[in-house]
Structure formats: structure tokens, C-alpha cells
Amino acid sequence: MSRGLGDVYKRQVQAESYGLYQSIFSRNKGILETSVMNTKRVVILGCGSVGSLVAMELARAGVGHFLLADPDVMEYHNICRHQCGIEDVGDLKINALSRKLKNINPKVHIEKFEGIVQNLPKTMLDEFCVANETIFVGCADNRAADVYTNRISIYYTASFISIGFWERAYAGEIFYHIPGRNMPCYECALGDGGNISARAQANHHICLLYTSDAADDLTRVD
């Protein structure tokens, strides 16, 4: 009895199941457990050079849910500092960054809003935010936006962190607020006027926190 080519291949090819998701984060085990990080939710306000880097590093850490908010389009002058590239020029930053995050973790859940944080619909935040599982990250280089974001984070019992650089990277500024602790809000600590990058020199002392433990701290948001 003659055998077809298909019969030969059926015997020779052995398929093995491949756990893509588990393999992607296999090097994180014992440091950042996927089962913990996958439930975390991050709202990125401002998807520029800082916001895109923060989002991608959190995606690599295993964070499973993102809400990206930014009104801007990728332009050529963004490329030298942004995590997205020339192929993304002309598209919204939220779309370009979303593709990058999906390329790291195909199972990541992403919500997008084309606009500034002050215009984020409450219904969208209500659906996305989960108390003690959500963190707001302010990367808009705007104090008024960070003040507003911190107020929202308090409303949703979520942690808040603001990240920015002063003019010509003279210094970096990181502020964080964790609900339920005796900590000043952003407005009380830093005020609400101007852009962070417009600061040319320090006129008061701020906690400058550059640490590799930032992602690990996210696992303890509770």
C-alpha cells in the first residue's frame, strides 16, 4: 500500500508545547514573580522619552495591564530619546508604545487615551483602576498634570510616582506618594506651576531616588 508524503511527515515531526508567556519571564523568577506582577495595573501619563522607557521596563518586569495617555504624535526629533523609532513617525505615541509593549508581552492588556490626563474619562479610570493594585506614573513634564494625577491616585487608593528631568538633565526629580501613609501630596511638596524640565537649578532639596529596586517596590504596593 502506497504512502503519501503527508503520512511520512506525520511520523517524523513531533510537536512540543511551548509556553511562550512562561518562557518570556522565566529569568524573572525569584526576583519578580509573574503571578504577582501580572495583576498590577499602571497608568502612564505622558508617553514621551521618559514614559516610554518606564512602560517598557515595567512590561519586561511582567506588569500585565497598562493605560497609556498622551495627545502627541511621534515626530523625527523624538527619535533620539524615545523608545520608539523611525517606523513609528506620524503615529500617535500611545499607538507606537502599545506596539512595543505587545512585542515584549503579547498577552499584555492595554487601554489607550489620546489626550491629557485632565481629560481622561472617569468611566475609563473606573473600569481600569483596582484599589491597591494600581500605580499612576506621571511623565508629562508638567506640574499641573502631576498635581491632578496625584489627586486621582488618592481617589482610587493607588500609588503615584512622578518622574522628570531638569533642563539639560542637570538633575533628576522623582516624587512618590503611597496612600494610607503620612506623606505629603505632590502639590504640598512641590507646588503646581511650570514644567519640570524648565528648572535650571535647585532651589530646594528634593529626594532624588535612582534605584534598581523600583520595579521590586511595585510588587509591594498594597
Features from the language model and the residues they span:
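A structured beta-alpha segment of the ubiquitous adenosine-cofactor-binding alpha/beta core
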Residues: 98-133, 140-142
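Short, surface-exposed basic-aromatic patches at helix termini and helix-loop junctions that form
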Residues: 59-62, 126-131, 147-159, 178-180
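Single conserved hydrophobic/aromatic residue that forms the stacking wall/gate
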Residues: 1-9, 210-222
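Glycine-rich phosphate-binding loop and adjoining beta1-alpha1-beta2 segment
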Residues: 73-105
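Adenosine-phosphate binding glycine-rich loop
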Residues: 178-212, 220
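ADP-ribose/adenylate-binding Rossmann-like module
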Residues: 135-173
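Glycine/serine-rich phosphate-binding loop and adjoining beta1-alpha1 elements at the start
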Residues: 3, 7-40
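Glycine-rich adenosine-cofactor-binding loop
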Residues: 33-63, 70-73
